[in-house]
């Protein structure tokens, strides 16, 4: 993604994260996931990430509103395909459609990169996430333990149409 995408629904703009956003992204993630700490009995993995490394090594896009970072999505390609590694929405923006918009952005990025599916995972006790992902077309395909985390893996087929390799004469 290049540049800024102004005029998004909800009055925010999307742009690539930069190194100078590290502290703001870390603070956003801490705020977005804080309510899960008691529920799952530990810090969710996104709260333990080093965001200077994440911003350097992955595609991180932030959503800004009035100059403040209120959302972020972390994307990467893995052996399984195009991964939405993290979606974080500031508590003040929950219920505004920002999370869904970040997921739609991620899906568009996957299509642009030539992928016909996108996958993600979430803790099994993050039931709001599971419900949202199911509502918008994600289907559970696996459950795995990763350390102390019981994770639900979900995938969404994007219905990409691949260009034909034949040419007309």
PLM feature spans:
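A generic secondary-structure micro-motif detector
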Residues: 40-41, 96, 119
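C-terminal "cap" of GNAT-fold acetyltransferases
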Residues: 52, 60-61, 116-139, 143-169
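Conserved glycine-rich acetyl-CoA-binding loop
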Residues: 68, 86, 90-104, 111-113, ...
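Acetyl-CoA-dependent GNAT
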Residues: 3, 7, 12, 16-86, ...
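Generic detector of contiguous secondary-structure segments
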Residues: 13-19, 98, 115-117
């Amino acid at each position: 993604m290049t540049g800024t995408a102004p005029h998004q629904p909800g009055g925010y703009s999307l742009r690539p994260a930069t190194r100078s956003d590290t502290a703001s992204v870390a603070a956003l993630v801490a705020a977005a996931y804080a309510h899960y700490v008691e529920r799952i009995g530990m810090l969710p993995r996104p709260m333990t990430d080093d965001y200077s490394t994440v911003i350097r090594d992955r595609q991180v896009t932030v959503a800004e509103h009035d100059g403040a970072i209120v959302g972020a999505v972390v994307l990467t390609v893995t052996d399984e395909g195009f991964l939405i590694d993290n979606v974080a929405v500031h508590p003040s923006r929950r219920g505004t459609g920002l999370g869904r918009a970040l997921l739609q952005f991620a899906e568009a990025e996957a299509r642009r990169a030539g992928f016909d599916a996108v996958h993600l995972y979430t803790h099994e006790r993050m039931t709001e996430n599971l419900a949202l992902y199911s509502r918008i077309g994600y289907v559970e395909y696996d459950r795995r333990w990763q350390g102390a985390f019981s994770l639900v893996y979900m995938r969404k087929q994007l219905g990409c149409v691949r260009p034909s390799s034949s040419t007309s004469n």
